[in-house]
Amino acid sequence: MAPWSGLWGGKLAAGESPVLRSRFYAFIRAFVVLSVLLLIVELGAYINGWDDLAASALALPVIGVESLYASWLRFRATYVAPFIQFLTDACVVLFLIQSADRLIQCLGCFYIHLKRIKPNPKSPALPDAEDPDAAYYPMVLVQIPMCNEKEVYQQSIAAVCNLDWPRSNFLVQVLDDSDDPTTQTLIREEVLKWQQNGARIVYRHRVLRDGYKAGNLKSAMSCSYVKDYEFVAIFDADFQPNPDFLKRTVPHFKDNDELGLVQARWSFVNKDENLLTRLQNINLCFHFEVEQQVNGIFLNFFGFNGTAGVWRIKALDDSGGWMERTTVEDMDIAVRAHLRGWKFIFLNDVECQCELPESYEAYRKQQHRWHSGPMQLFRLCLPDIIKCKIVFWKKANLIFLFFLLRKLILPFYSFTLFCIILPMTMFVPEAELPDWVVCYIPALMSLLNILPSPKSFPFIIPYLLFENTMSVTKFNAMISGLFQLGNAYEWVVTKKSGRSSEGDLISLAPKELKHQKTESAPNLDAIAKEQSAPRKDVKKKHNRIYKKELALSLLLLTAAARSLLSKQGIHFYFLLFQGISFLLVGLDLIGEQIE
């Protein structure tokens, strides 16, 4: 799924259902109050030496306040502990299944590297694009959907216009859904400048901006001239393909009529900007290096990432085209194309630069959409998957692995096991959660996640803690999408910084000069003028307060104090550091602050 950064039509989405948010927070708050009360009781028992009653409370009669505590111990052991132990065992089973899935994927990736397996086009490398008749240069439509992306539109348009492909054989569509008149004017002027420099590029703006990104792409595909093109490459507004992108992706389609999609991996211009971007980089490196590559090699199927990919237009049409029914139109079209028998290729060695969200607020909203959308899609696609005439193992892979295990079970057990059940077992010690579940296997899984980005090894502990912290957002999103709560169907702006715009345009200038024989790269003067102009109305950055994260921080720190009384070392340290992680996130002390 792509980190889509636009907002189409309607009001700005808060990213989650207000009803679900309030109920979820009320549940966490009640749990915190209960845990504090239990901690007070346990502290009193510890001070008075009643902790020895735990072994004899079921047999020996006691009197006074001590008898009340003994009654609580009997009730806890008889009624509470079995229920919590059942929940614990169920979550541990899910945890082991998911860990086994992750391990198998890592072994598949290791096998790919060991055997040096990679997709190779059946045709040889393409010669210089100046001679389009010398080789395979099919007609390619290049689309840049965007919406109010003032910070990044110049670099994406410049990068796409400098693609090394015969000018007569590709057309750029700038699909601008901006509702800001100033942004519309800037983008329209940028397109005009490239047109004047010889680029085949058109500007499209919709009056009725329905359907979000899917509606934008669907509208663009309805143009009469699209019938003249065989393939369509899609780049979100913050993506900057290298000049040889089409030369390294399109040849895979030649003599391979079953191939519907070629997907490239992402690289990030701001991965070292702050701790938040470093942790995101770990996650996404694993996603591309392991998940996408393994599924592409062994299954010829994976979720389309929404950008930096080339589709065969026939495959899009055969699969029903772009649909606006969910907020994950990229995954939607990929699943439908897979059900129609189309194959996918993932190119791990072809990279396309983009940006990572630098603030926690932007990242949280992005993750909410990424985890609510698949649940919407699962509800809609399940009947089609069951009725589809594909082989059984492909149906099983889609239902049990692609959707249930990786999109539903993972966020469910992560939140439930480490944020709910683990604290509960501290106050109900008769229900046990083994050390290897709390520490050893999560550490191993984090180590596997970090292998595709070995330079990130020093961040392994922050990564583990932050992933557990994000589980509250992912769990909330999953429930929202599964039960169609609130604004699960709304888009959320992902703020972009446009950090590399001027440098990238300058680096593209020689390429543009070489092909078009012009005097200067478009809009460099405008950039310089904008930078020299005095800035007005500079907005102050501030920290947001996230109540759910702060409440969970208090819960985990309370449980840590209780585990200290029980002398449970590993549990204490895990709860302590996890509680601190929730505290830092709740105070918005990770990543850039928002304006």
From Swiss-Prot:
Q: Which residues form the active site?
A: D177, D330
Per its UniProt entry, what is the enzyme's top EC class, as one word?
transferase
What residues does substrate bind to?
D236, D238
- Which positions, given as ranges, span the membrane? 30-50, 77-97, 408-428, 433-453, 545-564, 570-590
Chain segments annotated as coiled-coil in the UniProt record:
none
Which controlled-vocabulary keywords does the entry list?
Cell wall biogenesis/degradation, Glycosyltransferase, Golgi apparatus, Membrane, Transferase, Transmembrane, Transmembrane helix
What does the entry give for GO biological process? Answer: cell wall organization
Subcellular localization, per the record? Golgi apparatus membrane
Q: SUPFAM superfamilies from the entry? A: Nucleotide-diphospho-sugar transferases
Could you say which EC number(s) this protein's record lists? 2.4.1.-
In terms of Pfam families, this protein maps to: Glyco_trans_2_3 (PF13632)
This protein's record includes keyword Metal-binding = no
| One Gene Ontology MF term | glycosyltransferase activity
Function of the protein = Probable beta-1,4-glucan synthase rather involved in the synthesis of the xyloglucan backbone than cellulose. Seems to work simultaneously with xyloglucan 6-xylosyltransferase. Xyloglucan is a noncellulosic polysaccharides of plant cell wall and consists of a glucan backbone substituted by xylose, galactose and fucose.
Family stated for the protein in its record: Belongs to the glycosyltransferase 2 family. Plant cellulose synthase-like C subfamily.
Name of the protein described by the UniProt record: Probable xyloglucan glycosyltransferase 9
Q: Which organism is it from?
A: Oryza sativa subsp. japonica
> What gene is it encoded by?
CSLC9
